[in-house]
Amino acid sequence: MSASVSVQIAHPRTLAAVRRQVRIGQVGAAWKPALDKVWEFLRQNPGLHTDGHNIFLYHHPTNREAPMGVDFGVEVSRLFEPSGDIALTTTPAGKVASALHVGPYERMRETHDVIHAWAKANRMTLAGKSWEIYGDPAHDPSKNLTRIEYLLT
């Protein structure tokens, strides 16, 4: 499985999200409790979510050993008042390195690595933020679609 990387222009996506500090490699244990809170909030606020995606927004630290802020969110249709752990946030706008990961979530690291290698080979600088836009889960995990985008400087 080898992803193709392209440069795209990303538009901001508005999210209802819960931010957590997570070490690289521990996202798998943190995402569900955070998203459960977001979905509970959305059920209590009808019309806020119409057809958006689950999106994880990563705020990369300069030290790869440090925890990073991750906004575990759901795309929403309008602005809202934050409540408790639920924050209003947006993905960045601008030029991004973008790749489509096709396959199990457990193998997304491979697509992230392809983007990092592409950036290095093309002398592009990553700007410290990336996000994953999740499609609907497939019955066959090998068919899951997740768009991965890294903001470029």
Regions found by a protein language model. Name each.
Residues 1-153:
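A solvent-exposed interaction/effector surface
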